[in-house]
């Protein structure tokens, strides 16, 4: 099993941080679901697709409110907060492989940070624009929004 992970929102101005993971057993699991980057979808279409994705596939969602984000950022970085959140939703699904949208200018470093937060073996691949290039991450992006 593999999963894709993405997030939406990042702090007091934007509201809560919502992190979502969507799991697939094969790439064909997404057949019939027109996933693309959630920013390109109208809200009604995004809601319809989110319902379809979460009905057909295993998913995990974590919501971190803006107060908790602000408190964490007093002593640590936003990248670490998001990496830990990515790891939490990955851990709920326990895939062998996870694709995450990189939140660091060095994508490979971000992938290592997420992997270090996991307590089970999982190959984590972090990529910039993964929400545009990997359908499973696009699906997670739709669910997160």
Please identify what each model-predicted range represents.
Residues 1-3, 7-145:
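Acidic (Asp/Glu) carboxylate-rich active-site/surface patches
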């Amino acid at each position: 099993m593999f999963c894709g992970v993405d997030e939406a929102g990042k702090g007091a101005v934007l509201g809560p941080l919502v992190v979502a993971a969507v799991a697939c057993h094969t790439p064909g699991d997404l057949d019939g679901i027109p996933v693309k980057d959630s920013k390109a979808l109208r809200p009604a279409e995004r809601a319809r697709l989110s319902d379809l994705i979460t009905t057909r596939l295993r998913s995990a969602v974590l919501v971190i409110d803006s107060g908790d984000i602000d408190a964490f950022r007093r002593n640590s970085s936003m990248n670490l907060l998001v990496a830990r959140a990515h790891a939490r939703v990955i851990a709920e699904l326990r895939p062998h492989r996870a694709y995450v949208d990189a939140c660091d200018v060095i994508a490979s470093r971000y992938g290592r940070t997420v992997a270090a937060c996991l307590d089970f073996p999982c190959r984590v691949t972090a990529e910039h624009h993964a929400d545009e290039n990997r359908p499973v991450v696009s699906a997670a992006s739709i669910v997160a929004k």
